[in-house]
């Protein structure tokens, strides 16, 4: 529906600046729908189940949007995973109850020592926080902004003496088939997401398998 409205807007001959504003809003709405798609939770549960079976649930960071955090918390709780959220709400002032650390520093320390198996992160890990012990990352809310996704990936692939490999799961949403014009617009809109997926895949040890999945995604 949004794609059809985008096509109609592109075909219209109204005021250019007004159309440009409407176009940007529609693109943003579409990006939010993709970022928070319900189908992502099924894939997320499958990944958690696999990691749980392999006993590889420590050192996990899950990057989410604000709309996803409660559902992700519910899934982790149902799997008896010890986690903590890390958002911009956690304090940065040192306090005695956090062993003379800030709340944020305390949470990160608990994660590093294994007291928290997973962190649910919103934005605050995009820059400025170093957690080299993190070895697994799930991108529930992926960004097409190169700076943002490079910073998120960087949180996971940072070298550490106790880390031989880093594992990234980028959960993406496929497009829905429509008429030819809709499909053409869909493909153009998804180009940025494809670039992120390819960049991650091409730098992975399992690049052949990862790129095959991207080809199927196309």
Language model features: what each stretch is:
Residues 1-60, 64-67, 71-78:
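Interdomain linker/hinge connecting the two RecA-like lobes of the SF2 helicase core
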Residues 49-53, 112-113, 161:
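Residue-level signal for alpha-helix termini/capping positions
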Residues 61-63, 69-126:
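Conserved helicase ATPase core of P-loop NTP-dependent helicases/translocases
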Residues 65, 88, 142, 171-173:
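Cofactor-binding loop segments of dinucleotide-utilizing enzymes, especially the Rossmann-like FAD-
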Residues 66, 73, 131, 150, ...:
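Conserved strand-to-helix beginnings and helix N-cap segments that scaffold or border functional pockets
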Residues 118-122, 126-143, 148-151, 165-171:
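A short beta-strand element within the Helicase C-terminal
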Residues 155-190:
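Conserved segment of the helicase C-terminal RecA-like domain
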Residues 180-218:
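Long, largely alpha-helical accessory region at the distal end of helicase-like NTP-driven motors
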């Amino acid at each position: 529906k949004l794609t059809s409205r985008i096509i109609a807007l592109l075909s219209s001959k109204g005021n250019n600046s007004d159309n440009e504003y409407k176009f940007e809003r529609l693109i943003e709405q579409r990006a939010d729908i993709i970022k928070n798609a319900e189908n992502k939770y099924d894939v997320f549960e499958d990944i958690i189940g696999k990691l749980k079976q392999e006993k590889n649930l420590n050192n996990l960071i899950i990057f989410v949007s604000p709309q996803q955090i409660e559902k992700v918390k519910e899934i982790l709780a149902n799997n008896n995973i010890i986690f903590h959220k890390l958002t911009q709400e956690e304090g940065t002032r040192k306090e005695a109850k956090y062993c003379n650390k800030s709340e944020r520093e305390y949470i990160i320390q608990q994660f590093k020592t294994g007291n928290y198996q997973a962190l649910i992160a919103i934005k605050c890990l995009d820059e400025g926080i170093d957690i080299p012990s993190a070895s697994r990352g799930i991108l529930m809310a992926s960004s097409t902004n190169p700076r943002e996704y490079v910073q998120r990936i960087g949180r996971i692939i940072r070298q550490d003496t106790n880390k031989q490999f880093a594992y990234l799961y980028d959960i993406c949403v496929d497009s829905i088939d429509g008429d030819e014009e809709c499909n053409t617009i869909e493909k153009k809109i998804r180009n940025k997401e494809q670039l992120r997926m390819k960049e991650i895949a091409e730098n992975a040890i399992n690049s052949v398998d990862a790129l095959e999945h991207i080809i199927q995604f196309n």
